[in-house]
């Protein structure tokens, strides 16, 4: 992260695909380089809801002005962003955060093009209803509403970059589950995490 009106140069000796998440900043935070070894990594869910989350600016000591960013890696056939949840009102347990998913899907046998499915549906006071196929390079904007699941088709591992921003100055991620589906979390206690995870190296 960098303060406003700061020029930053990015280089890679081996080449790279670089994503530059951004949002409107209202305060200046210290310039911060977060090497791979300091990225917060974790496994969420269990069984067919297993996925890996790499936190770049979410739940760690990277200071931002409104911006949150992480990436989610989901093995083919699994569901992520599940149970469905929302963050479209400001309360003690939730923050208003608009969200963008940028997707990449691992090709299958013979370079078969993979795909995934994304669901968004109404939350109280917010009318939205989306169920769409997504492929590599697609972006879905989630301004409000319950979102999830993100479903990786069997055989096609799913990646998405998750970028959020909202009006609150505290830059924290607080969300609430759809109460009809939050019970699903209890079922994870009796299931193993998918053995295909982690998909990238984990940090302690």
Predicted features and spans:
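A short glycine-rich, His/Asp/Glu-containing loop-to-beta-strand
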Residues: 52-100
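Generic beta-strand structural signal
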Residues: 6-8, 14-18, 66-70, 99
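Short, conserved beta-strand element in jelly-roll/cupin
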Residues: 71-74, 93-125, 133, 141, ...
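Conserved metal-binding segment of the jelly-roll/cupin
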Residues: 1-13, 23, 133-154
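Short Gly/Pro-enriched loop/turn and capping motifs at secondary-structure junctions
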Residues: 107-110, 123-125, 146-149, 155-156, ...
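A short secondary-structure junction signal
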Residues: 29-34, 67-70, 79-87, 114-119, ...
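Double-stranded beta-helix
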Residues: 16-58, 122, 154, 161-204
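Short, structured patches in soluble enzyme cores that scaffold and shape functional sites
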Residues: 12-14, 20-24, 57-60, 70-76, ...
